[in-house]
Amino acid sequence: MSLGRYIGWSILAFTYLVLAILLRLIFLQPSKTSRASYRPKDAKCSLGVFLGSGGHTSEMKALLSTLDYERYQPRTYIYCHGDDLSLRAVSDIESSKGGLISSKMYYLLSLPRARRVGQPLLSTMVSVLKTLYIAALRLFLIPLLKNPRRPFVDLLIVNGPGTCVVLVLVSYIRRILGLEYTRIIYVESFARVKSLSLSGKMIRPLADRFLVQWPDASDSDNVIHKGLLV
Protein backbone atom coordinates (compact mmCIF):
# COMPACT_ATOMS: atom_id res chain seq x y z
CA MET A 1 0.00 0.00 0.00
CA SER A 2 1.37 3.41 -0.96
CA LEU A 3 2.06 6.02 1.70
CA GLY A 4 -0.70 8.26 0.34
CA ARG A 5 -3.32 5.52 0.53
CA TYR A 6 -2.14 4.54 4.01
CA ILE A 7 -2.51 8.10 5.25
CA GLY A 8 -5.92 8.34 3.58
CA TRP A 9 -7.20 5.17 5.24
CA SER A 10 -5.77 6.30 8.60
CA ILE A 11 -7.60 9.63 8.38
CA LEU A 12 -10.82 7.86 7.36
CA ALA A 13 -10.59 5.40 10.26
CA PHE A 14 -9.89 8.21 12.70
CA THR A 15 -12.85 10.20 11.36
CA TYR A 16 -15.15 7.21 11.92
CA LEU A 17 -13.82 6.90 15.47
CA VAL A 18 -14.55 10.57 16.14
CA LEU A 19 -18.08 10.23 14.75
CA ALA A 20 -18.71 7.13 16.85
CA ILE A 21 -17.61 8.95 20.00
CA LEU A 22 -19.79 11.96 19.22
CA LEU A 23 -22.82 9.75 18.57
CA ARG A 24 -22.19 7.92 21.83
CA LEU A 25 -22.07 11.23 23.69
CA ILE A 26 -25.22 12.55 22.04
CA PHE A 27 -27.53 9.53 22.21
CA LEU A 28 -26.34 7.48 25.17
CA GLN A 29 -25.66 8.06 28.83
CA PRO A 30 -22.12 7.47 30.11
CA SER A 31 -21.40 3.86 30.95
CA LYS A 32 -22.59 2.95 34.44
CA THR A 33 -19.61 0.61 34.82
CA SER A 34 -17.08 3.38 34.34
CA ARG A 35 -15.42 4.64 37.46
CA ALA A 36 -12.96 7.16 38.73
CA SER A 37 -10.01 5.73 40.59
CA TYR A 38 -10.56 5.87 44.36
CA ARG A 39 -7.86 7.03 46.74
CA PRO A 40 -7.68 8.29 50.32
CA LYS A 41 -7.71 12.05 50.85
CA ASP A 42 -3.98 12.16 51.58
CA ALA A 43 -2.96 9.93 48.65
CA LYS A 44 -1.04 11.23 45.65
CA CYS A 45 -3.14 12.41 42.69
CA SER A 46 -1.70 12.98 39.22
CA LEU A 47 -2.86 16.29 37.80
CA GLY A 48 -3.31 17.64 34.28
CA VAL A 49 -3.54 21.40 33.75
CA PHE A 50 -4.39 23.09 30.47
CA LEU A 51 -2.86 26.52 29.94
CA GLY A 52 -4.95 28.27 27.34
CA SER A 53 -2.69 31.30 26.76
CA GLY A 54 -3.28 34.97 27.60
CA GLY A 55 -5.84 35.69 30.29
CA HIS A 56 -6.75 32.00 30.61
CA THR A 57 -3.18 31.17 31.59
CA SER A 58 -3.07 34.06 34.06
CA GLU A 59 -6.28 32.85 35.72
CA MET A 60 -5.03 29.27 35.85
CA LYS A 61 -1.80 30.46 37.44
CA ALA A 62 -3.85 32.16 40.15
CA LEU A 63 -5.99 29.04 40.65
CA LEU A 64 -2.89 26.90 41.20
CA SER A 65 -1.31 29.29 43.69
CA THR A 66 -2.87 27.44 46.65
CA LEU A 67 -2.41 23.94 45.25
CA ASP A 68 -0.96 21.25 47.52
CA TYR A 69 2.02 20.34 45.33
CA GLU A 70 3.06 17.48 47.60
CA ARG A 71 -0.21 15.72 46.98
CA TYR A 72 -0.91 16.62 43.35
CA GLN A 73 1.99 14.99 41.59
CA PRO A 74 3.18 14.35 39.04
CA ARG A 75 1.74 17.34 37.20
CA THR A 76 1.33 17.56 33.44
CA TYR A 77 1.06 21.03 31.93
CA ILE A 78 -0.61 21.03 28.53
CA TYR A 79 -0.12 24.04 26.29
CA CYS A 80 -0.35 24.98 22.61
CA HIS A 81 2.56 25.15 20.18
CA GLY A 82 4.36 28.48 20.31
CA ASP A 83 2.73 29.65 23.55
CA ASP A 84 5.80 31.07 25.29
CA LEU A 85 3.64 32.87 27.87
CA SER A 86 2.32 29.57 29.20
CA LEU A 87 5.82 28.08 29.31
CA ARG A 88 6.97 31.01 31.43
CA ALA A 89 3.89 30.55 33.62
CA VAL A 90 4.86 26.92 34.27
CA SER A 91 8.32 28.04 35.32
CA ASP A 92 6.81 30.64 37.66
CA ILE A 93 4.30 28.17 39.11
CA GLU A 94 6.89 25.51 39.87
CA SER A 95 9.61 27.87 41.08
CA SER A 96 7.15 29.49 43.51
CA LYS A 97 7.60 26.42 45.72
CA GLY A 98 11.36 26.88 45.79
CA GLY A 99 13.52 23.82 46.25
CA LEU A 100 10.74 21.79 47.83
CA ILE A 101 9.45 20.57 44.48
CA SER A 102 11.52 18.31 42.28
CA SER A 103 11.67 19.05 38.57
CA LYS A 104 10.84 15.38 38.01
CA MET A 105 7.38 15.98 39.43
CA TYR A 106 6.04 17.79 36.38
CA TYR A 107 5.96 17.34 32.62
CA LEU A 108 5.19 19.48 29.60
CA LEU A 109 2.92 18.42 26.75
CA SER A 110 2.53 20.56 23.65
CA LEU A 111 -0.44 20.30 21.27
CA PRO A 112 -1.39 22.20 18.11
CA ARG A 113 -3.96 24.91 18.71
CA ALA A 114 -7.49 23.83 17.76
CA ARG A 115 -8.57 27.29 16.63
CA ARG A 116 -6.98 30.70 16.24
CA VAL A 117 -8.81 33.99 16.63
CA GLY A 118 -10.45 34.94 13.32
CA GLN A 119 -9.65 31.61 11.70
CA PRO A 120 -12.03 30.65 8.83
CA LEU A 121 -14.50 27.85 9.49
CA LEU A 122 -13.06 25.38 6.95
CA SER A 123 -9.49 25.64 8.19
CA THR A 124 -10.79 25.52 11.76
CA MET A 125 -12.32 22.10 11.09
CA VAL A 126 -8.98 20.86 9.75
CA SER A 127 -7.02 22.22 12.72
CA VAL A 128 -9.53 20.78 15.21
CA LEU A 129 -9.19 17.32 13.65
CA LYS A 130 -5.41 17.63 13.76
CA THR A 131 -5.49 18.58 17.44
CA LEU A 132 -7.97 15.81 18.19
CA TYR A 133 -5.80 13.23 16.42
CA ILE A 134 -2.60 14.19 18.27
CA ALA A 135 -4.38 14.54 21.62
CA ALA A 136 -5.97 11.10 21.20
CA LEU A 137 -2.53 9.59 20.58
CA ARG A 138 -0.77 11.29 23.47
CA LEU A 139 -3.53 11.41 26.06
CA PHE A 140 -5.43 8.22 25.32
CA LEU A 141 -3.74 5.64 23.09
CA ILE A 142 -0.13 5.81 24.32
CA PRO A 143 -1.12 5.83 28.04
CA LEU A 144 -3.56 2.98 27.32
CA LEU A 145 -0.80 0.85 25.80
CA LYS A 146 1.54 1.60 28.71
CA ASN A 147 -0.97 0.86 31.46
CA PRO A 148 -4.59 0.07 30.49
CA ARG A 149 -5.74 0.44 34.09
CA ARG A 150 -4.67 4.03 34.56
CA PRO A 151 -5.77 7.22 32.75
CA PHE A 152 -3.09 9.68 31.67
CA VAL A 153 -3.93 11.80 34.76
CA ASP A 154 -6.33 11.33 37.66
CA LEU A 155 -7.62 14.91 37.52
CA LEU A 156 -7.77 17.43 34.67
CA ILE A 157 -8.38 21.15 35.28
CA VAL A 158 -9.33 23.36 32.34
CA ASN A 159 -10.68 26.90 31.97
CA GLY A 160 -10.78 27.45 28.21
CA PRO A 161 -10.38 28.32 25.40
CA GLY A 162 -11.41 26.03 22.52
CA THR A 163 -8.52 23.57 22.62
CA CYS A 164 -9.61 22.44 26.08
CA VAL A 165 -12.82 21.06 24.54
CA VAL A 166 -10.68 18.63 22.56
CA LEU A 167 -8.83 17.59 25.72
CA VAL A 168 -12.09 16.91 27.52
CA LEU A 169 -13.47 14.85 24.62
CA VAL A 170 -10.32 12.72 24.52
CA SER A 171 -10.34 12.31 28.31
CA TYR A 172 -13.96 11.13 28.07
CA ILE A 173 -13.09 8.15 25.85
CA ARG A 174 -12.05 5.99 28.81
CA ARG A 175 -15.32 6.76 30.58
CA ILE A 176 -17.28 5.67 27.52
CA LEU A 177 -15.31 2.41 27.40
CA GLY A 178 -16.00 1.70 31.07
CA LEU A 179 -12.37 2.15 32.16
CA GLU A 180 -10.98 4.10 35.08
CA TYR A 181 -11.18 7.67 33.92
CA THR A 182 -9.93 11.19 34.48
CA ARG A 183 -12.03 13.49 36.64
CA ILE A 184 -12.70 16.79 34.85
CA ILE A 185 -13.00 20.19 36.54
CA TYR A 186 -13.91 23.21 34.44
CA VAL A 187 -13.55 26.71 35.88
CA GLU A 188 -15.34 29.39 33.90
CA SER A 189 -13.42 32.58 33.22
CA PHE A 190 -13.64 35.55 35.58
CA ALA A 191 -14.79 37.57 32.56
CA ARG A 192 -17.99 35.51 32.14
CA VAL A 193 -20.30 37.44 34.46
CA LYS A 194 -23.80 36.67 33.15
CA SER A 195 -23.40 33.78 30.72
CA LEU A 196 -21.17 30.83 29.90
CA SER A 197 -18.52 30.88 27.22
CA LEU A 198 -18.90 28.68 24.14
CA SER A 199 -16.27 26.30 25.50
CA GLY A 200 -18.11 26.20 28.81
CA LYS A 201 -21.42 25.36 27.15
CA MET A 202 -19.80 22.48 25.27
CA ILE A 203 -17.97 21.08 28.29
CA ARG A 204 -20.71 21.51 30.91
CA PRO A 205 -22.46 18.16 30.20
CA LEU A 206 -19.13 16.32 30.42
CA ALA A 207 -17.48 17.93 33.45
CA ASP A 208 -17.55 16.32 36.90
CA ARG A 209 -17.39 19.78 38.46
CA PHE A 210 -18.32 22.96 36.60
CA LEU A 211 -17.48 26.11 38.54
CA VAL A 212 -18.43 29.71 37.82
CA GLN A 213 -17.25 32.82 39.62
CA TRP A 214 -20.36 35.01 39.33
CA PRO A 215 -23.87 34.13 40.59
CA ASP A 216 -25.62 35.28 37.40
CA ALA A 217 -23.65 32.71 35.41
CA SER A 218 -24.91 29.79 37.51
CA ASP A 219 -28.46 29.58 36.17
CA SER A 220 -27.70 26.38 34.23
CA ASP A 221 -27.92 22.79 35.44
CA ASN A 222 -24.82 21.22 37.02
CA VAL A 223 -23.18 24.61 37.50
CA ILE A 224 -21.68 25.51 40.89
CA HIS A 225 -21.08 29.08 42.03
CA LYS A 226 -18.01 29.18 44.26
CA GLY A 227 -17.39 32.92 44.28
CA LEU A 228 -14.26 34.60 42.97
CA LEU A 229 -11.45 32.09 42.51
CA VAL A 230 -8.82 34.26 40.83
Curated annotation (Swiss-Prot):
The keyword Endoplasmic reticulum applies. It holds the Pfam family Alg14. It is a single-pass membrane protein. Signal peptide: none annotated. Keywords: Endoplasmic reticulum, Membrane, Nucleus, Transmembrane, Transmembrane helix. It comes from the Eukaryota. GO terms for biological process: dolichol-linked oligosaccharide biosynthetic process. The keyword Membrane applies. Gene3D superfamilies: Glycogen Phosphorylase B (3.40.50.2000). One of its GO terms (cellular component) is UDP-N-acetylglucosamine transferase complex. InterPro entries: Oligosacch_biosynth_Alg14. Its main location: endoplasmic reticulum. Residues 28-230 are cytoplasmic. It is found in: Endoplasmic reticulum membrane; Nucleus membrane. Residues 1-6 are lumenal. The chain crosses the membrane at residues 7-27. Belongs to the ALG14 family. Involved in protein N-glycosylation. Essential for the second step of the dolichol-linked oligosaccharide pathway. Anchors the catalytic subunit ALG13 to the ER. Heterodimer with ALG13 to form a functional enzyme. This is UDP-N-acetylglucosamine transferase subunit ALG14. The lineage of its organism: Eukaryota, Fungi, Dikarya, Basidiomycota, Agaricomycotina.
